[in-house]
Swiss-Prot record:
Belongs to the thioredoxin family. DsbD subfamily. One of its GO terms (molecular function) is protein-disulfide reductase [NAD(P)H] activity. It is a multi-pass membrane protein. This is Thiol:disulfide interchange protein DsbD. Required to facilitate the formation of correct disulfide bonds in some periplasmic proteins and for the assembly of the periplasmic c-type cytochromes. Acts by transferring electrons from cytoplasmic thioredoxin to the periplasm. This transfer involves a cascade of disulfide bond formation and reduction steps. It comes from Ralstonia nicotianae (strain ATCC BAA-1114 / GMI1000) (Ralstonia solanacearum). Its EC number is 1.8.1.8. Disulfide bonds join C131-C137, C202-C322, C516-C519. Keywords: Cell inner membrane, Cell membrane, Cytochrome c-type biogenesis, Disulfide bond, Electron transport, Membrane, NAD, Oxidoreductase, Redox-active center, Signal, Transmembrane, Transmembrane helix, Transport. The keyword GTP-binding does not apply. The chain crosses the membrane at residues 193-215, 227-249, 259-281, 302-324, 344-366, 373-395, 400-422, 435-457.
Length: 608
């Protein structure tokens, strides 16, 4: 066998590595306390539809959200009036600031603004406000777009107006395409998904047949390895293209996916597909299609590397009908992320996982593969529950928060029942049934926690016991917080720091706003902690209230390169700003560690 026989294989390998490398390069490093400037976290654009109508779009970065009730429109001059805004439904989120459920938007927001008989050009001013999941709330942002009532064609997209409180800090301009997602973790997850998909009952029996078609009857082990890998890479190219297409489609479908009917239709599709995984019906291509595709693949030379790659691409459609439901769930996830690069990398990893057993068979390691049996049926059922979870995840943005928590509870408990968690194990049960029992108990407890949380007033499935914690904190007799001295301008801060330096005391400057959810959490959960109060006993406590978002407030935020509250700046006893700062919400333990790093144990008195 000559080296030239491996050239097509090498080209396929290079293509696969190039796809993965491009996806990796798309991920910048992001520190835990780096936040996007508001104009990048909430990218504003607008297009004039006709003389009176403007379509407004916000591209919301991953890890950020906007408030529905904070959206408002105005005109300059103010004589122009507008029809009432028709905003799409948002995701319901419990807001600690207002102590009620509020609607929020993620990923994308599209709505139209209609002026009432505007005769002359005017500027449309859109006011919006949003927050980051990590705890920072931005001041209200005003974006401006020029409207020409006589315009007959769409105007170009508007440039965003720099929001109040933005700064030139380099760290805040680090943009994360995945919103902090880990591409390596996503690749490993989809690689494992591909392995699991291969071991479903309708795919595993086909591995020896496919191996015989690809490798041929008289291939050496080296030749078999080359042809098998080529087959897998051919299949991977198809799946990668599907993943990229799903990501690109997701970018264009984000606005449509905010519609409750569209979300409901996708969720219903996931439920229908899950029924196939539970064995209620068989899902596969029509017999005529499968026959024609098989004939086309059989006409190719069985032992050629290039032919194997083409057959791998064809087999992406005919090899595994059982893969279709789980693949649909994966594509639904990719489409919602709206990231084409991640979509391609994820599906490439999944196809590689699906191809590993085929390569093992091709090189003669078929004896390492498990036999088909009952556990493979269980694997299909696991995917069925995953698809039900995908359905719930898709429709969750339009569900009331309490209903979403109840639905997750029902799904988790149903999975526990399927694992026979509440059935007695025989005395001679093996390790796998016992492991299933353990997993079932964990699922049942997780479902019970959701029910307890919703009964206690929790409204977040990821933090189901938040209501219990709020009730517990409210019941504490000693919930006194620290007392701050209010400052309103840069000059007042400088004067207060100089006064503290004269007495040899360090300073802590806290940024606060009434509309800041995480500020309320810091006030209620962190600054009321006895250990925090003790550690701050000898520290001069300043607080800048930037609720009004006036000129002095913006100057203060800019002075310390902040986008918004909550944030805490420290000064040592000599008046020097400490390199350590707190951005976003921190619980008492974490805040104490930050305080001691900033001021040292000598100045930040440790609690006893």
């Amino acid at each position: 066998m000559t080296l030239s026989a491996f050239l097509p294989l090498r080209r396929l390998l290079q293509l696969g590595l190039l796809l993965v490398a491009m996806a990796t390069l798309a991920l910048p490093a992001r520190a835990a306390d780096d936040f996007l400037p508001p104009e990048q976290a909430f990218r504003f654009s607008a297009v004039q539809i006709d003389g009176q109508t403007v379509e407004v779009k916000f591209a919301i970065a991953d890890g950020y959200y906007m408030y529905r009730e904070r959206l408002a429109v105005a005109a300059d001059p103010a004589t122009v009036t507008f029809a009432p805004l028709e905003l799409p439904p948002g995701k319901v989120k419990f807001d600690d600031t207002f102590n009620k459920d509020v609607e929020t938007y993620r990923h994308a927001l599209v709505f139209r603004v209609k002026a009432r008989e505007a005769a002359s050009p005017f500027s449309l001013i859109v006011t919006s406000q949003g927050c980051a999941d990590q705890g920072v709330c931005y001041p209200p942002m005003k974006s401006r777009f020029r409207v020409e009532p006589a315009a007959a064609s769409p105007a170009p997209p508007a440039a965003p107006l720099e929001a109040a409180g933005s700064s030139d800090a380099l760290g805040g301009r680090i943009a994360s395409t995945l919103g902090g997602g880990n591409l390596g973790a996503i690749a490993v997850l989809f690689l494992g998904l591909g392995l699991l998909l291969t071991f479903t009952p309708c795919v595993l029996p086909m591995l020896p047949i496919l191996s015989a078609i690809v490798v041929g009857e008289h291939a050496t082990r080296m030749r078999a390895a080359a042809v098998s890998v080529a087959y897998v890479l051919g299949m991977a190219v198809v799946y990668t293209a599907v993943g990229v297409a799903a990501g690109l489609a997701g970018q264009g479908l984000q606005a449509a996916l905010q519609n409750a009917w569209v979300l409901g239709a996708f969720a219903a599709l996931m439920v229908v597909l899950s029924l196939a995984m539970f064995g209620l019906y068989e899902l596969q291509l029509p017999a005529a299609w499968r026959h024609r595709l098989t004939q086309a693949s059989n006409r190719l030379s069985g032992g050629q590397v290039a032919g194997a790659a083409v057959m791998g691409a064809l087999s992406a459609l005919i090899v595994s009908p059982c893969v279709t439901p789980a693949l649909a769930g994966a594509l639904a996830y990719i489409a919602q992320t709206g990231n084409a690069m991640v979509g391609g990398a994820a599906l490439f990893s999944m196809s590689i996982g699906m191809g590993v057993p085929l390569v093992l068979v091709g090189v003669g390691a078929g004896n390492l593969l498990p036999r088909a049996g009952y556990w493979l049926v269980v694997t299909k059922a696991i995917f069925g529950f995953i698809l039900l979870g995908v359905a719930l995840w898709i429709v969750q943005p339009v569900l009331p928060a309490w209903l979403a928590m109840v639905a997750w509870a029902v799904l988790l408990i149903a999975a526990a029942v399927f694992l026979r968690t509440f059935d007695s194990l025989p005395a001679d049960a093996g390790p796998l049934p016992r492991l299933g029992k353990v997993v079932g108990v964990v699922l049942a407890l997780a479902g019970a926690v959701q029910l307890v949380g919703v009964a206690a007033g929790g409204r977040d499935p990821l933090q189901p016991l938040a209501g219990v914690m709020r009730a517990s904190a409210g019941a504490q007799p000693d919930a006194r917080g620290v007392v701050f001295q209010r400052v309103k301008s840069v000059s007042e801060v400088d004067e207060a720091v100089r006064a503290a330096t004269a007495t040899g005391r360090p300073v802590m400057l806290d940024f606060y706003a009434d509309w800041c959810v995480s500020c309320k959490e810091m006030e209620r959960l962190t600054f009321t902690d006895a250990r925090v109060r003790a550690a701050l006993a000898d520290v001069v406590l300043l607080q800048a209230d930037v609720t009004a978002d006036g000129a002095d407030d913006r100057a203060l935020l800019k002075r310390f390169s902040l986008f918004g509250p909550p944030a805490t700046i420290f000064f040592d006893a000599q008046g020097n700003q400490a390199p350590v700062r707190v951005v976003g919400f921190e619980r008492a333990e974490t805040f104490l560690a930050s305080l001691r790093r900033a001021l040292g144990t000598a100045q930040a008195k440790p609690s006893t």
